[in-house]
């Protein structure tokens, strides 16, 4: 038997390697035996005094990337960790084995047969993963959004009447066969899905559903070969989203991934992948990845609408508005001091409430999540029309309500709900459009004049800055909030 000296499950692997090495007298053969026995997710880098010049590597579900230079080989769980050494990388698939030594990498399948792997060249360097003069990564990434959105749009919008997504050209005619669509993700990406699903259904008439990835596998989704499933993940490694993707593929769905990290697991397993072009996002709280996800999901909805022959004047107006988004966000960022002032309302509060309707509801969910993540202020987001069904009992003198009303067809309804909170003593910060101002609110910010379907992208930026400055007032580490990780690679 073996005596254990720690409480980590990884020690099991060490003892199993020892056990099988004694049988096989070969470290690679021992590792092949080990990976057929262990269960769960793992990324293994094994070194031994028996062959000290080699590193033996294997993975299942967990991310692992390998880099190679002329005189060195490196491995890490994420691309930025190795960009100081090389931009040429390999992505290991589940149950594959890599053996690293100086300047050389060999790859094998789980049975020991040699295999060839293609090199992927990463299109950015590690300078993009530095603070670049900003105090924090989060603030830097908020300010990078105009550029990130422009890069995400580059080559995908032609003139004023055409969306180009060559990643989906192979299924251009297949969109006519889908009778439903699912959008699946976790956290911030799920909020992007709520907007994307709303837009797709609005533009195409395809019945569209959203589901949190951790629930998708267990709700027995009624999906089949006539279902399109869209999976969104910044890292492309989110374990719950990966598991949901695999279930959808088992059921015959057409799967589309939206990811930011080139060569990530989700992007490799999905039938088709559309990349956001946000560049590396280091802060745990997502900002530029979120707004570029919104952009890609908007482009997806418009591309499918185009494939179905649904172009009209509204369609052309939206395309014209898309091109203006980077400049509008530049202008919003010039009002940063205004949003820092809005954050001062949160200094001594333990609770705040966000309200909106339709697309604005998805936006306030994300705004509330940002505040919770980085400032640890309890924040709840509600559909404005649901206030009277319970949540309004929480509103009292001095409560803070952050309201978003950017959809002209329902803004009057939201404004009525805002007045209800004011009557009960709430202080209201309102983000709205010209002509929808409300009396007696504490603060009003008028957003640029764009098509309502685009407002989610714009209003996200002030909400991010409010969360950022509220965290600063409370002395919180915005880049590394407590109990959170950038990429959640366990279920």
Predicted regions and their residues:
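Conserved short alpha-helical segments that host acidic/polar catalytic motifs at enzyme active sites
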Residues: 1-135, 144-179, 218, 330-333, ...
């Amino acid at each position: 038997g073996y005596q254990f000296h720690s409480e980590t499950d990884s020690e099991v692997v060490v003892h199993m390697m020892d056990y099988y090495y004694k049988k096989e007298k070969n470290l690679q053969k021992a590792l092949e035996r080990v990976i057929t026995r262990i269960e769960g997710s793992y990324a293994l880098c094994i070194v031994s005094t028996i062959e000290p010049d080699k590193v033996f590597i294997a993975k299942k579900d967990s991310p692992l990337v390998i880099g190679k230079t002329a005189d060195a080989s490196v491995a890490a769980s994420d691309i930025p960790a190795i960009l100081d050494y090389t931009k040429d990388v390999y992505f290991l698939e589940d149950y594959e084995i890599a053996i690293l030594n100086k300047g050389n990498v060999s790859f094998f399948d789980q049975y020991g047969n040699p295999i060839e792997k293609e090199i992927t060249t990463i299109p950015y360097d590690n300078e993009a993963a530095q603070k670049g003069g900003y105090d924090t990564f989060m603030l830097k990434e908020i300010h990078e959004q105009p550029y990130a959105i422009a890069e995400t749009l580059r080559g995908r919008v032609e003139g004023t009447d055409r969306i180009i997504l060559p990643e989906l050209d192979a299924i251009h005619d297949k969109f006519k066969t889908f009778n439903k669509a699912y959008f699946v993700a976790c956290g911030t990406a799920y909020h992007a899905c709520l907007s994307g699903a709303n837009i797709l259904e609005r533009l195409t008439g395809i019945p569209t559903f959203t589901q949190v990835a951790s629930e998708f596998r267990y709700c027995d989704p009624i999906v089949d070969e006539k279902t399109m499933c869209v999976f969104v993940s910044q890292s492309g490694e989110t374990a719950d989203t990966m598991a949901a993707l695999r279930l959808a593929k088992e059921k015959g769905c057409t799967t589309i991934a939206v990811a930011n990290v080139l060569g990530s697991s989700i992007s490799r397993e999905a039938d088709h992948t559309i990349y956001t072009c946000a560049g590396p996002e280091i802060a745990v709280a997502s900002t530029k990845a979120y707004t570029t996800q919104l952009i890609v999901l908007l482009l997806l909805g418009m591309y499918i609408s185009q494939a179905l022959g649904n172009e009209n004047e509204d369609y052309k107006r939206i395309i014209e508005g898309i091109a203006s988004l980077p400049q509008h966000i530049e202008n919003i960022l010039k009002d940063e001091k205004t949003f820092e002032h809005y954050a001062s309302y949160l200094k001594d509060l333990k609770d705040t409430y966000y309200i909106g309707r339709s697309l604005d509801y998805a936006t306030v969910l994300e705004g509330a999540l940002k505040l919770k993540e980085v400032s640890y202020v309890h924040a709840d987001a509600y559909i404005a029309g649901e206030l009277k069904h319970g949540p309004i009992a929480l509103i009292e003198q001095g409560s803070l309500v952050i309201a978003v009303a950017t959809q002209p067809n329902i803004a009057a309804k939201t404004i009525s709900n805002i007045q209800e909170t004011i009557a009960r003593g709430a202080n209201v910060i309102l983000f709205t459009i010209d002509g929808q101002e409300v009396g007696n609110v504490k603060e009003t910010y008028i957003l640029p004049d764009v098509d309502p379907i685009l407002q989610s992208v714009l209003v996200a930026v002030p909400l991010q800055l409010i969360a950022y400055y509220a965290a600063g007032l409370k002395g919180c580490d915005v880049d590394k909030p407590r109990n959170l990780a950038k990429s959640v690679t366990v279920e």
